[in-house]
């Protein structure tokens, strides 16, 4: 029996013992996301008109920018988010981040590419970089969820991924617990770029949620 047949048998046994489930309702689903949850996700999509800076949904086209972006200077050109952070998305992301559901990240990435491939290709990023975790947090969790997203997006779009050059220099408080000004203060001097990094024109920065 050759290796391909052995691997297929292994995969069949694994799928029987641990069947793939929808990341949003945990029902067994071989297609990734079940039909019922796809309907819910369609309603949770961040739609146009979007803020021209951060990508959040805004009330009218004439507005152009959300309130936060009109009063805050950002160090990036444009942000994009796929879904609003509401149930079942927020519960699914929580499982992805804190309960070792790494497969969810692959499914999220596939959905992100479906929605934003043309936009990303228009940006022509030289590399993709995941937002890093502090080493102690990564050791505790076992993985960086943003890195899973970045690597899958890079694989699909054939864009190099650099997950080593951007580093977290100090531990920070969870952003979701902080107000706007506290978030800015929390992240100040929290990141650095290694001196070995060779500068490029465009970087696609990836994280699991926008705060």
Predicted regions and their residues:
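Glycine-rich phosphate/pyrophosphate-handling loop used in enzymes and phosphotransfer proteins
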Residues: 1-211
């Amino acid at each position: 029996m050759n290796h391909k047949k052995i691997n297929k048998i292994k995969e069949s046994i694994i799928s029987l013992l641990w069947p793939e489930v929808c990341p949003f309702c945990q029902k067994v689903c071989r297609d990734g996301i079940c039909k019922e949850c796809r309907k819910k996700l369609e309603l949770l999509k961040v739609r146009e008109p979007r803020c021209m800076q951060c990508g959040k949904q805004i009330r009218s086209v004439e507005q152009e920018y959300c309130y936060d972006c009109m009063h805050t200077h950002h160090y990036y050109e444009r942000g994009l988010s796929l879904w609003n952070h509401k149930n079942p998305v927020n519960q699914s992301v929580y499982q992805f981040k804190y309960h070792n559901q790494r497969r969810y990240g692959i499914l999220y990435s596939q959905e992100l590419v479906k929605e934003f491939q043309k936009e990303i290709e228009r940006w022509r990023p030289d590399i993709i970089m995941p937002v890093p975790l502090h080493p102690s947090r990564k050791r505790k969790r076992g993985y960086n969820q943003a890195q899973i997203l970045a690597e899958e997006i890079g694989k699909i779009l054939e864009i190099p991924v650099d997950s080593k050059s951007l580093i977290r220099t100090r531990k920070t408080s969870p952003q979701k617990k902080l107000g706007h000004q506290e978030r800015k203060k929390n992240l100040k001097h929290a990141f650095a770029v290694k001196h070995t990094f060779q500068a490029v024109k465009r970087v696609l920065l990836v994280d699991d949620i926008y705060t």
